[in-house]
Structures are given as C-alpha cells and as structure tokens.
Amino acid sequence: MNVVFVSGNRTWGGSEELWSATAAVLASDGHRVTVFKSGVDDSEPRIRRLRALSSSIRDLARFPLMPRRLFTLVRSLSSGAAYGHEVVRLLIGLALSRRPDLVVVSQGGNHDGYFLAEVCRRLHLPYAIVSHKASELYWPADWQQKTIAAVYRAARSCFFVSEHNRRLTEEQLGFPLPRAAVVRNPFLVSWEPRTDWPDDRSELRLACVGRLHPKEKGQDLLLRVLARRRWRERPLSVTFYGDGLQRTSLERMAHNLGLAKVTFAGFVSDVAAIWSDQHGLVLPSRCEGMPLVLVEAMLSGRVPIVTDVGGNAEVVDDGITGYLAAAPTEDALDEAMERAWSERHRWREVGAAAAARIRTLIPREPESCFATRLVELASSAKAL
C-alpha cells in the first residue's frame, strides 16, 4: 500500500504521536510511506526513525532556495501566506507523486487542518481525517463551514480520540458522521503494571503535565486553588512538567501568589520517571481530546484528578479510579481536589484501580491497531 500522512501542526506534541508511530508500523511492514509535515525537526526521534525506514518526509513549511530563517520570518509576518504556501506545497507534492491508496490528514483540533484535507478532496484522493481535540472554545467561522462540512462528508473515515470530540464535532457541523470512529493514542510508558509507590510519609506530590498554555490547559486555575489558605497549609507540592509560550508568565504568577511548594520542571523526555516520584496527576484543563498524560498516569497506577472536559470522564470513574471536577473552574477544581485529599489514604488503591481500568479501555499497541484499520480502509478505497 502507498499511504501518505499529512500533519499541519508546526510543533511536536501529543497529536503527532499517533500518525508518526502508525507510519513507522506501516513502513516496517513494507508499505510505502510518505509524510508531509509543517516544520519538520530532523532531531525529533520519530522523524529519524521514519527516515531510517526509508520513508519520504517533506516539509510543508519550507520554500525551495529560501533560507529557513528567512521563511520563518515571512511566516511570522503573514500567517495567511504561510497557510497558502502549505496548500500549494501539498497540492504540488501530491499531484506529482504516485497516487496514494490513502491519505491520512492529522490535525491538532477538529478543523484546523481542513484546508489540507480540501487539497485531497479537490484531487479526488481517498483520505481519512484524524482529529485530536474538539472544544467549545473553538468553533469554525461561518465562512469556513461550507468547506469544512465538505471535507468531512467526503472523507473515507473520520477518527476522533474521544466520544466527546466526535459528538461535539457533529454538533458544530450540524450533521452526523456515519463513518466516524474513536481511536487511541500510543503512550510513552510501559504497559506492564507498576508495583512501586513513592514515599508519602512527609508529603504528597502531584504532577501537572502538559504544554504551558493556560487558555487550554488551565494551569492558572490550579495556581489560584493552591493559593487558597487550606492548600498552602497542607503537606502537598505540585510540579509542572512541560514548556510553552506562557511558562514565564505562569512562573511569575506562582511567585506573585507566594506559592513556595510549586515547581516548574520544564520538559521531561522520560515520562515514566515522572511517576517514580509523583503520587498523582492534577489536570485542570479547559479543553482536551483524550489526554495522553492521563492515560500514562493511569497506566502507571497514579491517581488522576481532572476536569470533566474532552474524553476525561470516559476513562475516569469519579471516586473509583480518580476524581472529576465538574467543570473547568476554580471552585469545581477545588471541590474535586478536596474530595481527593479527604481520601488520600486511598490514593494507592485508587491508582491501582485506575491502572486496571485503563487497560480495559485501550489496546496494548494502539499504533498497530490503527495501522491495521488504515490498511483495511486503503484496501476498500482501492477496490472502488
């Protein structure tokens, strides 16, 4: 099979894990794999892995003969020109290449990559859409709606990472998606259950893992809750793992609030190491798809305290395998954390229940399962 993966994300985050891992599985199985991605980082291990498997990787955010730094400047001055350039690059690349059996368009949200899928539709190529997030915070503009609806209707399949995301996308589009399905992301911790538990005699430790982007990830909500008197007085520390454009402002916010037991650890490549020292995950997100870090924390036997957004409630049973905040607000988060604190003697038990539960909801090798589905989809498209 000849399979093409297209990603319009200009950075590397959780939404890049599924397509890249699946592409590696297909390439290892002898399929022809081509990747079109904006902002290819040659130092990224997944990119190096795909190149080692003889996959063709093309950067949509490059202009022939123009230095990368100059093109980056042009893009920063005009995002519209950047999107237009990516469309042209993809259009030419697909038109001049051997006709693919399937194109997989991966987008970080549920409509931010629609213009890339539109290229496939215009070229009459069989394609599938993968959406990694849908949120009430982001609705397509009316002028986009006609094209977005067209690319979803024409897709061979529309994949989402949670049932919530599928349902919300149908609401935003105004029609059902009969060829929609939920897929799982690959995770970066061991499938084998952990039996260790960090020392909890002097204090409890929570990790808040993710991109430092309060609009979506809600770290500001957590800082305000931790600034409340009772949390200041408790033997609880919180470490923020991850980087982002708002790291400095969040650090300043924590300093201004006088939060002495809050630490910013930056990006950590060894995810499993996080859970060697932390007792639980606190995720105050305002929007999500299916947080990879939530799956990883549960696989690691750590207690999750999360807001009821995205697919969180699809894997966390409140009070049994974790704690759900009813909404992404300070009071709701405080209430969920308070319930968790009152049952802190049960955290290891809750973590064990979470570990058992999540293994019934996700496959051991999500990328292999997705690769199989894509081959079946490509085969059916080829037969038409």
Predicted features and spans:
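Short hydrophobic beta-strand element within catalytic cores of glycosyltransferases
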Residues: 303-306, 316
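Aromatic "clamp/platform" in nucleotide-sugar-dependent glycosyltransferases that forms part
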Residues: 108, 267, 286
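Conserved acidic donor-binding segment of nucleotide-sugar-dependent glycosyltransferases
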Residues: 318-319, 323-330, 339-344
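A short, active-site helix/loop in glycosyltransferases that binds the activated sugar's phosphate group
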Residues: 154-180, 189
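Nucleotide-activated donor-binding/catalytic signature segment of Leloir-type glycosyltransferases, i.e.
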Residues: 251-268
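A short, histidine- and acid-enriched strand-loop-helix "catalytic/donor-clamping" loop
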Residues: 108-111, 127-142, 157
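Conserved donor-binding/catalytic core segment of Leloir-type glycosyltransferases
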Residues: 4, 198-217, 223-226
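Acidic donor-binding loop of glycosyltransferase active sites
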Residues: 102, 276-289, 302
